[in-house]
UniProtKB/Swiss-Prot annotation:
Residue spans crossing the bilayer: 49-69
Pfam families, sorted: Collagen, SRCR
Presence of keyword Kinase: no
The organism's taxonomic lineage, starting at the top: Eukaryota, Metazoa, Chordata, Craniata, Vertebrata
Protein name: Macrophage receptor MARCO
Cellular localisation: Cell membrane
Organism: Mus musculus (Mouse)
Length: 518
């Protein structure tokens, strides 16, 4: 409801401003009827002028009445505002509520100044009303309407300021406006004076125990101490106890390989079996259809045991057996009798430092250990050579004719083999150095007399329609097979063209010919 009433007030004020503009626009026209007109013009058709003026006066009267109604409405609204805001403060919007064409644009200000600004605007309304009345009186009392020149009137006295209007009714509560744009950052203030030092704070809680520090770097070595004097010779110690028996010695080297045994006697040869007659060879039948797998037949009777074949040659010697396990240690010997302590010698004088002795010789070998137990049986040796094959057995009966198999599907057509080309382009697919194949080697062509006809024949051998000669293409290596090639352009091969003999040239590889086929 509050927003609708505000819209009505704005429409009402807009219509007031429109009427004020209309009056302002009409007043310059009415200035032609002033008494002090220097050159009064005679009016013809007084009846027509009277009718026009009557209509104009009616319109002015209606406008004045409407303006009066608006003033009364504004007074009621002021009373309502005063009732809502007992302390004289008004909550208003940022845009002006009342503005006139003749009055300065006065915006409503918050709190105490709002009511004063509204009263000032009402006084402007009263002033404009009085001016309209004076203009109306001037029009009605203008002697020119009756073609009578009137005397110039004296200026009227200045009007007294109008009494303040009655406060209007309080208006509806204004809606909350949209959030304004963020203001610009203010200039930084001047740094204030330094405050007094604060009082000493209370002692903080004891912090957690820190992690143990890393180990420090090794310190520098201290100074080398002085060399001490040689100590006195010690007393001869008692004879030590008898040492324990030494460990078993290493396993001895393996013995030499034994002599090969004598070959055994050959066993008696078995009697040969009767040879069967050879059957007639049947005609090869057509490949039959793949038959279904037959039922598994009964197991045949075991055949008569054949005569044993001759005894095979003895097998190779078996692999070396694993070494036997280490024998148990022998029993410890009885301890030796302790020797009597020697007589203490006289303390000798301090001797000089002796020369470092030579390395002693290697001690004698220890007593060999007990013989170990017999080793485990070695793994069996490799299989002997295969015996001689037995004689061929009798030929079996011919089998039954198989059914013809289904005709196989026709195989796919194979890809066409690539034909060997005797010419090629090096350095690109259709542009590069021209090379020919002769005497099982690739070689280049000299560019002497090399022209487009020669290049066209060369490209025709590769399936192109025409070619363009490139002189001094270079970059080749090996043989230079052709020189002074002279084709007419209709040949199918360079072999048909006029040229020097193969390998006869006076060129270097900087003069190798090139082609560009299309």
């Amino acid at each position: 409801m509050g927003s609708k009433e505000l819209l009505k007030e704005e429409d009402f004020l807009g219509s007031t401003e429109d009427r004020a503009d209309f009056d302002q626009a009409m007043f310059p026209v009415m200035e032609t009827f002033e008494i002090n007109d220097p050159v009064p013009k005679k009016r013809n058709g007084g009846t027509f002028c009277m009718a026009v003026m009557a209509i104009h006066l009616i319109l002015l009267t209606a406008g004045t009445a409407l303006l009066l109604i608006q003033v009364l409405n504004l007074q009621e609204q002021l009373q309502m505002l005063e009732m809502c805001c007992g302390n004289g403060s008004l909550a208003i919007e940022d845009k002006p509520f009342f503005s006139l064409q003749w009055a300065p644009k006065t915006h409503l200000v918050p709190r105490a100044q709002g009511l004063q600004a509204l009263q000032a605007q009402l006084s402007w309304v009263h002033t404009s009303q009085e001016q309209l009345r004076q203009q109306f009186n001037n029009l009605t009392q203008n002697p020119e309407l009756f073609q009578i020149k009137g005397e110039r009137g004296s200026p009227g006295p200045k009007g007294a300021p109008g009494a303040p209007g009655i406060p209007g009714l309080p208006g509806p509560a204004a809606e909350k406006g949209e959030k304004g744009a963020a203001g610009r950052d203010g200039t930084p203030g001047v740094q204030g004076p330094q405050g007094p030092p604060g009082s000493k704070g209370e002692a903080g809680l004891q912090g957690l125990t820190g992690a143990p520090g890393k180990q420090g770097a090794t310190g520098a070595p201290g100074p080398r101490g002085e060399k001490g004097s040689k100590g006195d010779i010690g007393l001869t110690g008692p004879k030590g106890e008898h040492g324990t028996k030494g460990d078993k010695g290493d396993l001895g080297l393996p013995g030499n390989k034994g002599d090969m045994g004598m070959k055994g006697d050959t066993g008696p040869m078995g009697s040969p079996g009767a040879q069967g007659g050879k059957g007639d060879a049947g005609k090869p039948g057509l490949p039959g259809l793949a038959g279904s797998p037959g039922v598994k037949g009964d197991q045949g009777k075991p055949g008569v045991q054949g005569v044993p074949g001759p005894q095979g040659a003895p097998g190779l010697s078996g692999a070396k057996g694993e070494p036997g396990r280490t024998g148990l240690p022998g029993p410890a010997g009885p301890p030796g009798i302790a020797g009597n302590p020697g007589i203490a010698g006289v303390k000798g004088s301090k001797g000089d430092t002796g020369i470092q002795g030579q390395k002693g010789t290697k001690g004698e070998s220890g007593v060999p250990g007990l013989v170990g137990r017999k080793g485990d049986t070695g793994s069996p040796g490799l299989a002997g050579p295969k015996g001689e094959p037995g004689r061929v057995g009798q030929k079996g009966d011919p089998g039954m004719k198989g059914s013809s198999g289904q005709q196989g599907q026709k195989g796919e057509k194979g890809q066409k083999g690539e034909s060997f080309q005797r010419v090629r382009i090096m350095g690109g697919t259709n542009r590069g150095r021209a090379e020919v194949y002769y005497n099982n080697e690739w070689g280049t062509i000299c560019d002497d007399d090399w022209d487009n006809n020669d290049a066209t024949v060369f490209c025709r051998m590769l399936g192109y329609s025409r070619g363009r000669a490139l002189s001094s293409y270079g970059g080749g290596s090996g043989n230079i097979w052709l020189d002074n090639v002279n084709c007419r352009g209709t040949e199918n091969s360079l072999w048909d063209c006029s040229k020097n003999s193969w390998g006869n040239h006076n060129c270097v590889h900087n003069e190798d010919a090139g082609v560009e086929c299309s």
